Amino acid sequence: MPIITLPDGSQRQFDNPVSVLEVAQDIGAGLAKATIAGRVNGERHDACDIIEQDATLEIITAKDEDGLEIIRHSCAHLLGHAIKQLFPDVKMAIGPTIENGFYYDVDLDRSLTQEDIDAIEKRMLELAKTNYDVVKKRVTWQEARDTFEKRGEPYKMAILDENIERTAMPALYHHLEYIDMCRGPHVPNMRFCQHFKLQKVAGAYWRGDSKNKMLQRIYGTAWADKKQLAEYLTRLEEAAKRDHRKIGKALDLYHMQEEAPGMVFWHNDGWTIFRELETFVRTKLKQYDYQEVKGPFMMDRVLWEKTGHWQNYADLMFTTQSENREYAIKPMNCPGHVQIFNQGLKSYRDLPIRMAEFGSCHRNEPSGSLHGLMRVRGFTQDDAHIFCTEDQIESEVTSCIKMVYDIYSTFGFTNIAVKLSTRPENRIGSDEMWDRAEAGLAAALAHNGLEYEIQEGEGAFYGPKIEFALRDCLGREWQCGTVQLDFALPGRLDATYVAEDNSRKTPVMIHRAILGSIERFIGIITEEYAGFFPAWLAPTQAVVMNITDSQADYVQKVAKQLSDVGLRVKTDLRNEKVGFKIREHTLRRVPYMLVCGDKEIAEGKVAVRTRKGADLGTFTVEEFAEILKNQVRSRELKLLNEE
């Protein structure tokens, strides 16, 4: 007679073992109809699963995050059901959930077209509309293998052979005539899977191994209701408009080419933004008492072996040889900073030493993962390393956290998710060292009153870290900043200081990055601002234009006046209508357009318009210069009279 304890603390007693759905029915018909699955003693179970002993139970519905994930997982099965009906010879591989959706890897002897995807989606909807029940059956390992052998599913057989114990009882989910294997849980009825959209097809190797066969990966998104789906698709449309690759090309910021995959060719305007970011960060380095250094971008293999990178990071490092010596191009700056620290005797009185670098790093990322500025092979880190005593950890990490929020707020990022990543399986250093490092970061977060999520096993191989993820205007998260404790690397590279008792001690090293990769950060803010950079970042801050040739000299004079006070200004003296010029520079997202006609010349003024079409009236050149200088100096996000 199981006693079921519900989330509100109430209990229900049953005479016999009872399913999750039967408990929901006992509570009420409305809840039963909404039941997708249940959390029994904290673990997710199908609605049909039987509870035999006393347990806690939380009913999962479409309103829960878990419920939405289950809907998406079941939509992957629905995709399998539909494609198997349309293409009976297709071989099914895996179909997991991902953020906002799902995918299924399939093996088909021809490439799927958009027409095929449309047909699959149509068939999925037709099947879902029949509201059929999903039937779960536990079978022996051999029964499962026999089932998939008869159905001609080699990938399912491989999963059984390689990933599932012979003593296990796998769950098979029956979707009418279609059968899939999964840990579950899944929806009890396809009425929950009505709001989805297939999005694209991409290539994916079986098991993620390039030595294996290339499969076709069909991506889709699924939501609990029509409104959620529509809102998500609208966000996708907006994201496509804001794609930094598209905007970067339109604004002539940079380009990439086959001869240098993952490497950025910065054009003048893009490089202007890059340098402005560096200048801004430098002002903060001075404010927070950092010294700026520059290390070599290539060092001998011997050094990388000492640090542990050669053993733990070799696949991502570019290497070369010269005069019988093997070198690695640095994937990160930290070993070089330790070498600088090691030059000359250091005392505890010298600590903390805060060492910063705009370091040019290279990582041999897989070609398939490269994506515009967001995932590159060559990048610049706004990197810093702080050498300190254990007693200084909390205050130094606190200072880093303050600096992170200080810098992010300048760009308008105030919604920041904080995550603490703990020790990975593949790591260096003792457990005791990791205990101290993780406790130190947790203490600093607590001291600053920050809520954070723990990411088990996601730390770097040399230390735990705090990650700062920016949430942009579309609700996406971008992990940029990190603060990482390292008790291991200084010792490996023989870094010491003279302690107060005259003994030699190893300093603690704090790795700190805020923008992360400057390239990637430019990609992020390009999409956040949709290319409408604030005046201080805009490559061209104002364009001065004439109406007729008679104003050309005045235009040149105004432009020189503004340039002389440090503003980035261009002239447009083309023999085109002024409306055409305004439209063109509006498309180029230039913050201000200054029009000079005979009236403006007579008054010694300029007529000012913004890129959003606002007519600000006329100003003397001195007045406008002061306004724009103040906006640049204070790094304002908005233009004049802009909401």
From Swiss-Prot:
Disulfide bonds: none annotated. One of its GO terms (cellular component) is cytosol. It is found in: Cytoplasm. Its main location: cytoplasm. One of its GO terms (molecular function) is ATP binding. Belongs to the class-II aminoacyl-tRNA synthetase family. This is Threonine--tRNA ligase.
